[in-house]
Amino acid sequence: MKRIMNLMVLISFWGCYSMYGAALQEEKTNFIPTQPHVNYQLKTTEGVAPKSIIFIISDGTGIGQYTVSYYANGEFAPARFDHVGLVATHPNDGECSTSCKRVTDSAASGTALSAGRKTYNGAIAVDVDKNPVKTMLEWAQENGMATGLVATSTVTHATPASFGAHVDYRKKEAEIAEQFAIADIDVILGGGKKFWPDSLISIYENRGGQFISDINTTVDSNKRILGLFSDSGLEKVHNGREVSTTQMAKLALENLDKDPDGFFVMIEESQVDWGGHSNSAEYIKGEMKSLNDLVNFALDYQSTHPDVLVVLTADHECGGVAVHDGNNGDLDVRFTSDYHSANFVPIWATGPGASVFDAFMDNTEIGKRLIEYIQE
């Protein structure tokens, strides 16, 4: 009942926004810039930390995108989670006496999620002074856990990069690839071969890695895996993506869950965000179908591995998506922008330690708590 009530609060909040979103888009306010000051009250843990963590990030996905999926695809896999909360995503970018920002990008929010630290837009796991900050993937490696990154974008894109690299600007994907090649991450799967020249692949392989370009390639269980299945990001779902997020997640878990010390894997459904930037309901619908399949796979896995914590959230919302009735019973999906918004995003969790996320929180609280679990 509590989970249902929390969902109702989320939906009610979004309904109010949807009704007045178009008008608000055009209204110029004179609010004095301030950063929010909230005493976040995350619960204490149940006393049992998870052995392993599956951290799913659906890029650019707010309540509007889930509403599109619910009505257009007839699916809402997150309803299977035990706990649900709400997340603020603003970056630390600018002085609030003059020009602070409420709208994050995937680099700043990725760093908040990976390291529990606020930073400026564009920063990849560095603080506002451009000093590296330690990520949960690096903490997991230090604690002897197997580690993995999966994305439907380039693997060097902002969100996955924020877990395994440190650069001052997100567009330095070639440099991020160079860092990944020597980072000893056990599994890296996604797109972006163009940032991995043969010389860099050789460096990776000489350090005990196996490069694959076909998801069906037999992998050596004694080697780390780098799978790059497209030159750039993977193909859109509605255009016939050949390698699904769930296929990559399955391959990752088959190789990570052999580690007796547990594993950490971040899996990004990257392109819901791109559908928001494109103002394409069809794009969003396809990527949300992929997300639903991924969530079902992860929760099915967790049901037979009860020591695994599964967390699903977003780095930010994109497009200011709202759903209305269209003609002849179809959906009228409206956008208030072609960029990110400051709208809160949901978080869901199931498994040991999941109940702490049944709250309103800043995105840094997610990173901090998951790092605490890894350190225990």
Language-model features: locations:
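Sec-dependent signal peptide recognition
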Residues: 2-10
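Metal-dependent active-site segment of extracytoplasmic phospho-/sulfohydrolases and closely related
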Residues: 63, 291-328
